[in-house]
């Protein structure tokens, strides 16, 4: 289940990740006219110009084990793509009319209100599904948007109501689903939610958005499977010791936030939605698509960062609904450090933090050698005593 966002030359191999998440900006995928790097694609009698995707295909082939050095698919990794929509003047028609405010946020909600935009996305998702549906360049998990309930920060939607937002998102989700599934029936499609479960810090609460989305999907396309890409950061984001937070993250669906401490609330709630909507038990899958803990290099936070990454991984490892645990960054991000977040396994000068070797060995026979020294830090006598179903014999990765 161990994963990382992005690809780092040398370190992707060394850490031994089994899951890799990549971001794709849809604004880079579309051109309004023929130009270098874009290819014509005719769909339902209309010709569009979409990015050739050569570089991304090469990356995904490498991750799937089909690069020139390993032509027989060795060391295959599961690839997750997150599809985002930034602002480009000439492509503003692809952004929902209520959200067309340049500079309002990093990413915007898609336009399902106007026919030209809908047709473009339908064609684009079919094109991408074809390119990334072959077993050599297969994308296993597709996520539409980033933290879509956070509609004032990551999925800007202007003044749209919750029901309008969820319905518009679900319509785009259905287009992506059909585009992906027509080529790769085993690939999964995910909704992205932040850690605000009942709190609405930057838009709507995750639970409210999920409920609206699930209801709309059931009413309009009940046969479609959907899954959840969750970001269970601590609250606040700078808190590493998630295990001792008894205020923001509590037991029960009434909790304000969901972190790795109480991630079971999410997975149990999804089980209840399966029952409500007649879905097969266990069919709604979860990936932890973004997570990180902060540590300035050389400071004591290195210990809590390492402990948190490992403890969280163990929790995910023994939750049968969670398929992946994907950490935010190999290297501290300059934009994030300006906000006090040092989420990388390295600092900007490639100083290796303690978390690097811990994370590297979490799914090996040496896992406990690296994690047992942190038992006292997290206040546990053993991992079995704090993690239901913990079995050290199941920690080493298989089928890698």
What is each PLM-predicted segment?
Residues 38-40, 134-138, 152-153, 163, ...:
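Aromatic-rich peripheral "rim/lid" segments of glycoside hydrolase catalytic domains that contact
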Residues 1-28:
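Boundary/entry segment of secreted carbohydrate-active catalytic domains
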Residues 4-6, 22, 144, 191, ...:
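Conserved beta-strand positions
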Residues 18-199, 235-236, 332-337:
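Substrate-binding cleft and catalytic face of glycoside hydrolase catalytic domains
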Residues 4-14, 121-131, 206-216, 306-314:
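Short, acidic/polar
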Residues 51-58, 113-124, 168-172, 205-209, ...:
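Soluble or luminal CAZymes and related metallo-dependent hydrolases
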Residues 118, 140, 165-299:
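Noncatalytic carbohydrate-binding groove/subsite architecture in carbohydrate-active enzymes
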């Amino acid at each position: 289940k161990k994963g990382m966002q992005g690809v780092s030359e040398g370190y992707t191999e060394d850490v031994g990740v089994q899951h890799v998440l990549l971001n794709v900006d849809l604004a880079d995928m579309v051109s309004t006219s023929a130009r270098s790097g874009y290819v014509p694609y005719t769909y339902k009698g209309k010709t569009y110009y979409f990015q050739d995707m050569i570089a991304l295909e090469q990356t995904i082939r490498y991750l799937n084990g089909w690069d020139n050095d390993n032509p027989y698919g060795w060391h295959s990794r599961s690839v997750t793509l997150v599809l985002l929509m930034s602002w480009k003047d000439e492509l503003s028609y692809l952004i929902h009319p209520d959200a067309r405010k340049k500079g309002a946020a990093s990413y915007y909600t898609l336009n399902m209100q106007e026919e030209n935009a809908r047709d473009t996305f339908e064609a684009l998702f079919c094109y991408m599904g074809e390119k990334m549906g072959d077993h050599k360049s297969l994308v296993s998990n597709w996520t539409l948007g980033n933290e879509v309930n956070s509609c004032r920060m990551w999925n800007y939607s202007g003044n749209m109501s919750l029901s309008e937002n969820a319905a518009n998102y679900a319509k785009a989700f259905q287009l992506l689903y059909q585009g992906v599934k027509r080529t790769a029936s085993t690939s999964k499609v995910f909704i992205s939610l932040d850690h605000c479960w009942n709190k609405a810090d930057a838009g709507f609460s995750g639970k409210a958005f999920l409920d609206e989305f699930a209801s709309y999907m059931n009413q309009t396309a009940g046969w479609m499977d959907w899954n959840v890409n969750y970001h269970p950061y601590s609250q606040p984001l700078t808190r590493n010791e998630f295990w001792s937070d008894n205020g923001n993250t509590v037991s029960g669906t009434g909790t304000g936030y969901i972190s790795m401490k109480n991630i079971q609330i999410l997975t149990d709630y999804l089980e209840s939605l399966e029952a409500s909507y007649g879905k097969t038990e266990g069919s709604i899958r979860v990936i932890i698509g973004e997570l990180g803990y902060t540590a300035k290099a050389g400071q004591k936070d290195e210990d809590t960062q390492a402990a948190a990454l490992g403890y969280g991984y163990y929790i995910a490892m023994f939750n049968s609904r969670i398929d992946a645990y994907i950490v935010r960054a190999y290297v501290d991000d300059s934009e994030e450090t300006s906000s006090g977040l040092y989420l990388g396994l390295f600092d900007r000068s490639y100083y290796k933090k303690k978390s690097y070797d811990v994370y590297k060995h979490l799914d090996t026979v040496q896992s406990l050698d690296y994690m047992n020294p942190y038992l006292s830090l997290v206040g546990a006598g053993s991992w079995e005593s704090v993690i239901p179903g913990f079995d050290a014999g199941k920690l080493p990765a298989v089928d890698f």
